[in-house]
Amino acid sequence: MFTVALAKGALLQESVSMFSDVGLDFSAVLDDSNRQLMVPSACGRAKALLVRNSDVPVYVSYGQAQLGIVGFDVLQEQKLQVSNLVDLGFGECHMSVAVKSSSGYLSASDLPPNCRVASKFTNCAKHFFDQIDLPVQLVHLSGSVELGPITGMAEAIVDLVATGRTLRDNGLVEIEELFKSSARLVGHPLSLRLDKGPLQEIIDSIQIQSQTNLLSDGKK
């Protein structure tokens, strides 16, 4: 039996659906009455750990889960030792720099040196601003980073954007995209090397299923 780390929140429904498509039923985690954090699949071949999105790579990197599904943004932020196996094509969004729409800034390079930038993704932000050779003061926030520019605490934010509605509703505008993100199937490198077949079988099935889904979406 192998273990899969599933992220609570926005990716959970489609993650469960993806595993269901390849024969692993973890639908019990979607039951509102469920309080178990470790749930076996109906077939008994695997079990799922229900964890926070940011904890998925941690469980996988330590080998407590052999597979997991997590956003690419989390992988970029944490840089843990996990294998990025398959782009699953859902949970799509992008990481962007945003400012107040009234600021007049048109790109990240327009920001003044040593200005404050608020973000939940400070490692991603640091890497980006280092690349464009702009020194900034990073302010780590755990949520509602839009309040940084609104309150005047920060000149800009670095955050995930899906539809952009939250930014618009709060008078903010994107000025630069760092990278695109989507859900990824990740694996524990050593477990993959020692695998006698079961893990690779699931990985191959998920890769085929994700490609089928992408083709199907493209025809709609």
Curated annotation (Swiss-Prot):
EC number from the UniProt entry: 2.4.2.17
Spans through the membrane: none
Cellular component terms (Gene Ontology): cytoplasm
Keywords for the protein's UniProt record, in alphabetical order: Amino-acid biosynthesis, ATP-binding, Cytoplasm, Glycosyltransferase, Histidine biosynthesis, Nucleotide-binding, Transferase
Compartment(s) of residence: Cytoplasm
Taxonomy, superkingdom: Bacteria
Pathway(s) per entry: Amino-acid biosynthesis; L-histidine biosynthesis; L-histidine from 5-phospho-alpha-D-ribose 1-diphosphate: step 1/9
GO biological process: L-histidine biosynthetic process
Annotated InterPro entries: ATP_PRibTrfase_cat, ATP_PRibTrfase_CS, ATP_PRibTrfase_HisG, ATP_PRibTrfase_HisG_short
Matches recorded under CDD domains: PBP2_HisGs (cd13595)
Catalytic activity: 1-(5-phospho-beta-D-ribosyl)-ATP + diphosphate = 5-phospho-alpha-D-ribose 1-diphosphate + ATP
Gene Ontology terms for molecular function: ATP binding; ATP phosphoribosyltransferase activity
Assembly: Heteromultimer composed of HisG and HisZ subunits.
General function of this protein: Catalyzes the condensation of ATP and 5-phosphoribose 1-diphosphate to form N'-(5'-phosphoribosyl)-ATP (PR-ATP). Has a crucial role in the pathway because the rate of histidine biosynthesis seems to be controlled primarily by regulation of HisG enzymatic activity.
Domain topic, free-text comment: Lacks the C-terminal regulatory region which is replaced by HisZ.
Family of this protein: Belongs to the ATP phosphoribosyltransferase family. Short subfamily.
Protein name per its UniProtKB record: ATP phosphoribosyltransferase
Organism: Prochlorococcus marinus (strain NATL2A)
Gene: hisG
